[in-house]
Each structure stands twice: as C-alpha cells, then as structure tokens.
Amino acid sequence: MAEKHVKNMTKFERLTHQEFQRGFSLIEVLVALVILVIGLIGIFNLHIVAKRGSFESFQQTQASYYANDIINRMKLNRTRLANYSGDYTGELSKPSKGCDVAVGAVSLCSPAETEAWDLYQWEQSFIGAAETVDGQNVGGLDSPTACIDIDGNTVTVAVAWRGIREGAGTTYSGNECGKDDLGTRRRIFVVSTVII
C-alpha cells in the first residue's frame, strides 16, 4: 500500500518526501553523539572523584602509620617519655649521632640520643624526605604537622595534613594540631594510648 501511495505522488512530493528522510537519519546520529559525549564526561568525572578519594584514603593510612610509629618508638624509650612532647613540622636538624642499626650505628646510644634520633627519623619520614623529585619531597603527607601531648603516662599523638578540598574533618575540636597552618582543608588523625 505504501508503494501505491508513492506512485500516486507528484514528482515534487516524491522529492520532498525523500529529502525529509535523508536529513532525519543525520539528526539521529547527532543525538546519539550528544548522548555518547555526555556519558563520557560522566565517566571522566567519576574517575576524578575516585582518584581524589583514593588519595585521601592513602593520606589517612599514612597518618595512622606515622602516629603508631612514634608511639612504638616511645615505648622502647620510656625513660625519656616526657621529652617527646611537642609540635613537629619537619624542621629538626639531624642529630650528631645516628642510633639506627640499619644505617650502620655500631655503638649504643643513650636514651637522650635515641630520643633525638627517633624524632628526627620520624619527622623525615612523615615529610617524605626519602622520596624526592627535583629537590621536592614527594613522599609522606601533604604539608604535615604532628603534635605529641603527654600527660603522665597518657600519650596523645595527632598528625594533621592538608586534604585535597575543604571537608568535614576541619571542624574537629578535640585537637588543635595544625589548625592555624592548614586552615579549612585540614585533616587530622589522633590516637591516644597509655605507656607504662
């Protein structure tokens, strides 16, 4: 029946009918491309959000490691426990005597020398001094500040760093470590323990 309808059309009607059908398939292709592009943009945005979340998670894990590292060092040097208290930003100078057997220390260190070495090594670790590119530290935390508070045998270690964007972690009022330096992008990990 459709063929009869086309045969009964005038030449002008047939031409306009065919032209309409040719343009219609082009519009379908353009609509499909727009939908595809919108989908790809969504996938790229999802990838960026996942990368940010992965980086924030890695920083949180690193902060936990560094806090527990210094606590373990303090447990091994209990006689100097009160002297570990302070705020640390990576500005300690290298002690004159290295107390790490792994780097060739052959003589025993006093508790004071061990404390100085522990704090120096710990600071170098959380600022990422072991991993550098063109003189810049690329390991460790982003703009870290660490605070150790000691009240008798109770030790509180707070490690603060700069997050990728502003977040809910900035309003934590239980510890002020890094609050002034890191502003609204501050992230903080706090652990308390008792060393007997």
Regions found by a protein language model. Give the residues of each.
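Intrinsic low-complexity/disordered segments
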Residues: 14-18, 44, 59
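Short alpha-helix carrying the canonical HExxH Zn2+-binding catalytic motif
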Residues: 27, 64-67
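C-terminal juxtamembrane segment of a hydrophobic transmembrane alpha-helix
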Residues: 34-57, 74
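Short N-terminal micro-motifs specific to bacterial/archaeal maturation
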Residues: 17-20, 34, 54, 113
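Glutamine-centric residue-chemistry signal
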Residues: 21, 47, 60-62
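Flexible, low-complexity segments enriched in proline/glycine/serine and punctuated by aromatic residues
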Residues: 52-61, 68-196
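N-terminal leader/signal peptides at the extreme start of proteins
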Residues: 1-24
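N-terminal signal-anchor/signal peptide hydrophobic helix marking the start
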Residues: 22-34
